Amino acid sequence: MTELKAKGPRAPHVAGGPPSPEVGSPLLCRPAAGPFQGSQTSDTLPEVSAIPISLDGLLFPRPCQGQDPLDEKTQDQQSLSDVEGAYSRAEATRGTGGSSSRPPEKDSGLLHSVLDTLLAPSGPGQSQPSPPACEVTSSWCLFGPELPEDPPAAPATQGVLSPLMSRSGCKAGDSSGTAAAHKVLPRGLSPSRQLLLPASGSPHWSGAPVKPSPQPAAVEVEEEDGSESEESAGPLLKGKPRALGGAAAGGGAAAVPPGAAAGGVALVPKEDSRFSAPRVALVEQDAPMAPGRSPLATTTMDFTHVPILPLSHALLAARTRQLLEEESYDGGAGAASAFAPPRSSPSASSTPVAVGDFPDCAYPPDADPKDDAYPLYGDFQPPALKIKEEEEGAEVSARSPRSYLVAGANPAAFPDFPLGPPPPLPPRAPPSRPGEAAVTAAPAGASVSSASSSGSTLECILYKAEGAPPQQGPFAPPPCKAPGAGGCLLPRDGLPSTSASAAAAGAAPALYPALGLNGLPQLGYQAAVLKEGLQQVYPPYLNYLRPDSEASQSPQYSFESLPQKICLICGDEASGCHYGVLTCGSCKVFFKRAMEGQHNYLCAGRNDCIVDKIRRKNCPACRLRKCCQAGMVLGGRKFKKFNKVRVMRALDAVALPQPVGIPNESQALSQRFTFPPGQDIQLIPPLINLLVSIEPDVIYAGHDNSKPDTSSSLLTSLNQLGERQLLSVVKWSKLLPGFRNLHIDDQITLIQYSWMSLMVFGLGWRSYKHVSGQMLYFAPDLILNEQRMKESSFYSLCLTMWQIPQEFVKLQVSQEEFLCMKVLLLLNTIPLEGLRSQTQFEEMRSSYIRELIKAIGLRQKGVVSSSQRFYQLTKLLDNLHDLVKQLHLYCLNTFIQSRALSVEFPEMMSEVIAAQLPKILAGMVKPLLFHKK
């Protein structure tokens, strides 16, 4: 920026030509009031030239004849108060061709020529009569034409201000002598409100070979007395607001300080950024800097008092229609380029904008916003900003009835900005404004995973609270909407993200308080999670960790504690493996005497006495019960060599004290304790007891057997039964030990992949138990014998399903074996890319395989027979993959032709079929086989 060194005289003017300021002077920089009060002249300096005296009354309004001249401060205040009505009065004066009572001055010919030049329309060769230089009823002497009605057309400042920025000494190659300026679009503003700033280092006048700009803007800065601009990129000029009369005001161009040219920053008034033009908000000189905004946005400056003229309704409507019809606002580069061009580049492209630069034009809302206070971020807001607005929370929506953008970075508009996992948000109510639901929901599908896109209903059920919900941590699942209110509104992006940034930060935190397979949480979490009265099982499946509350009651088992040789009954130092369990000598002798003496011990308390080194002799009933639960049997092999594998096998038989509330516990214990000494005692492992207790109740199909069977009615009844069984599977999985330790997406994926296997496996078990495999026992009210199978339209499918109960009859599967195999079916199919909680999944699956081995050992004696039994049962699980694949294919074909076949499919079942069955049939899942084919 050229330094203002002196104030020279007015440059000579050629009659009939445009005004010609000297090279190096600012465009409309107003000098001090001294040179304008007299006609004295001085030597002309080459660097700075003042504005011609003939333009003094034009560019800076003077009082008309008959009025006392006011001081500059009073005149400024009057000008500001007349901003609202100045535009209409000037237009009325121009339209009626009104005249002023002021007599023409001595240079009236020159003034008329300048006015004709200034008021000339944008087309060449057109002119119009000059309005009067001054009017008594208004402090504004000149206004330009209205804003154009057509949005693509150039603003009115193009034709009004171009002659002002021209020189008489222009080169022939220059076009109208316009200044070279780059377009800098403030963030959040449409192109129709863009400002023009000269780039740093570029010539300010048309004498240099620069590219003409189609929209030059009039710039005027009022400096304080005695202040000089030392640097072109220095601080912004500060001063009091002052009204600008003349063509600059008429053009409606926003004022830009000269210091902003180097930085490339265009500042606009606060209300201008929201298109709320009728209200003029002036920045006070000592206003504090707003948090989250750039210093340039809060620096006090002289806005040169450009009147904020109202936009044309046609222009605003066209811009609104353009924003609504554009297809590039989907979070990509188009959104970044349209709303936030970089400051340093004159050509706003798709370059991502820095986060700190975004809030310059996104001002925080007013304390009491009006209904029309935020039209920019209202109904015609692009979807990229809509997503951000939907996530702002209930507080923001309660303060303002209209949506607006809070100052800050918009992650939807800046895809390259690394974001951590967003905190989960509660489900939002449906939008109140028409058309908002479609705009908000459309781009949300891009961030939804394949498993979760169709699992909204499953997720609602998984999140459904039963009794007192577990304590929610920082990543606890948000509550879902009430059942029966339609689809689940829970946003999938409310879950912890698995993006690269989240992976770099570390492993994703658990969604739930981590539960072990024994129903107990890990250390540091509260324990009441499973249903009341369920048995607690032994802890080997969670690295042998127990809650803090039981740390003093019993030892904590881990590999570090193995060398201590701890007794698994009382926690004392173990002397060896006695009767099959690692125990101390005291517990060994106690168990032998109790079993051989046939003592009938009774607990004086509630069968939950603490058994440790100090209190192990207080209650012999609880001590003997703990010995039996640990797996101590008379005649067990003794070994004194502490091998890790053998110790782990011994630790697998450890059990915690059972809680109160299990029915017939005392009777069962008394029966066990009165066995003869030579009889072998076989105790069911506690985890299998837990699986028995959480087994779902009987489910009815609701089929009307009084009417003759038709294909559509039979298939519809089977679908209704499948919907109820799917709900039962979800509830059962929530109670399954270890399942809720997995990621919520993994839980939904496993249920969606295995629901058909679980249903047909349960069908085989019911058919085997109730009708000995002679019929298909779907439900108590829907049993198909062979005759009804032949009459149905899916007889071949019934024959396929009939193979399962026949295998059960052949193998004589026990209930314990069935329950363990059922859990393994839930864990038998995973995605090709694996699960998010793959490590926890593998540990859980290995644990239930060990439980199956224990269930086999309850009936089979000997290693050979147990191994053969394990092979037969696992081979049956492998063969189920091919059988279920046929069911998947038939189910998908029926679902596609459901209208033609008049078959009804319930909502949740339809979601799973439409989303997952094509993926399963296409081989996009990985079956986990026990044996190679």
From Swiss-Prot:
Similarity field: Belongs to the nuclear hormone receptor family.
Region (AF1): 456-546
Record-linked PANTHER family: KNIRPS-RELATED PROTEIN-RELATED
Name used for this protein in its record: Progesterone receptor
Compartments it resides in: Nucleus; Cytoplasm
Region span, AF3: 1-164
Role summary: The steroid hormones and their receptors are involved in the regulation of eukaryotic gene expression and affect cellular proliferation and differentiation in target tissues. Transcriptional activator of several progesteron-dependent promoters in a variety of cell types. Involved in activation of SRC-dependent MAPK signaling on hormone stimulation.
Species of origin: Papio anubis
Annotated InterPro entries: NHR-like_dom_sf (IPR035500), Nucl_hrmn_rcpt_lig-bd (IPR000536), Nuclear_hormone_rcpt_NR3 (IPR050200), Nuclear_hrmn_rcpt (IPR001723), Progest_rcpt (IPR000128), Znf_hrmn_rcpt (IPR001628), Znf_NHR/GATA (IPR013088)
